[in-house]
Amino acid sequence: MLEHIGLEHEKVQVNPMKAKKQLPSAPEWTKVPVWVEADGEIITDSTPIMKHIDAKYNGGSLWNSEDDARRDKWLEWADLHMSKATIPILYGSMFSALKTTTRVSKLEKFGFISKRLYAWAGFPIMWGIIARSRVKKDGRKPKQLWHDLLSEFTDSFGDAEFFGGKSPDLVDLVAFGYMRSISPYPQFSQLTDHEAGMAWYRAIEATLKV
């Protein structure tokens, strides 16, 4: 969203090992992302943040739709299904979980000890407690789950390039955000052979002002 509309902002990294210290104590600030306006206004969770930014800084153009029911249906679908599919592909096996936590520790601004604690203590928690149960509950391998979701989503475009038609709308950017969250990790290679999904993903990337 921010890169798509070219909005200047300050990005603050949060070390998950120190989240309680780095995030304010308000109950709603228990996880990232959090958007804080210059006047102190706070918005939490990805989709509400994107709606807020679009309305305040982009004239609400990404939220505008000729079919509100279709937009609302697929926005809920993305938040429900794509969001839950990120954990299984990143942490669905012990090896995947280790690769992910190791990669996170290298990407983020952790201290020497925090990097190693997160990489080696984090992966059994994410795999054993969270991801494994989601994979078991769904029954599909993470790659198949993502391919099925990408097929379902891109089929909804009809003959258009984007869900929003000739240009991306908020639903496109929400779905793109979930898929992009996997891109820094080796597991993203499991998605690159989905032709329609990658064509849409690259088309969204081309709109980013970076």
Identify the role of each PLM range.
Residues 1-114:
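GST-like domain detector, emphasizing the conserved glutathione-binding G-site
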Residues 80-199:
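GST-like fold's C-terminal all-alpha helical module
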Residues 197-210:
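C-terminal active-site "lid" helix and adjoining low-complexity regulatory extension at the edge
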Residues 50, 54, 72-75, 147-150, ...:
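Non-transmembrane alpha-helical segments in soluble domains
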